[in-house]
Amino acid sequence: MANFLNRYIMRHLFPVFLLIVVGLLIAPFLKAQSHADKILKDEITSDLKENILSFWEKYSVDPSGGFYGSLGRDGAPIADAPKGGVLNARILWTFSTAYRMYGDAAYRKLADRAQRYFIDHFIDPQYGGVYWLIKADGTPLNTDKQTYGCSYAIYGLSEHFRATGNNESLQKAIELYRTVESKIKDPVNDGYIESFTREWGTPQKLGYDGDGVATKTMNTHIHVLEAYTALYKVWKDDGLRERLAKVINLITTKLYNSQTHHLILYCDSNWNNLDDIDSYGHDIETSWLLTEAAEALGDPEVIGKCRKVALE
């Protein structure tokens, strides 16, 4: 059942999150250079506010706390569905970004609600890190630690601080960053291990769905990159800067095939390639994440390198 729910969340809710991201990131930057450009900008902004954000604002709030773990196509809540750490971190990021961009008090209210619930229910107060799933009542269900989930937590909390100035969000993001570096980073070969038990031991199965075969994955590393970029934008720490630069280097050297110009999806702990699958969607996503990270660092040499890889 847990595996089914994990797959459902990733396959059905992830595309919705991508639509939100595209709308939030593109809408402000579409300059009305022509009548057609203005029409496109207005359509994207309207769709984002009236069809996407409004849907989640109307249907996702759980009166008993936080947000429902799953909704039907008509918005009807599945009240007993478990709540995912990644979904809730994305809700936190989404409404924080929406508030920062549009200044709507309703978005601020939802962002604050998501922040409070996430900190109180998803962050492990004993061992650190983020639970993968909690029950509908907010108690832990799957306490495994997935690096992917911890990364999204840093991403969402950093954005909440950026949007609202809430220092608790920044401090929690910093704590999670330090946990990732102390518990998840490979001390021998660098990079970030995929999965752990609650106590940071080796899990019986790898990956968020338990079907993973790789100790290190491209997907996890690009979201560590994304999280560290978001945190560095609001916390100019020298150690974080060094690690952000290192993650950029790992992606462009260990997880990028310079012959095929595709990403390497799955590796063992020594960075040996475990498969020859190409993922065009992740290639596109990473091209943007790399350039964003490089621009956050502000190093012309790194920016040039990342733009070259992105265009290849």
Task: Enumerate the predicted regions with their spans.
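Glycan-recognition and catalytic cores of secretory/periplasmic carbohydrate-active enzymes
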Residues: 33-312
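Bacterial Sec-dependent N-terminal signal peptides
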Residues: 1-35
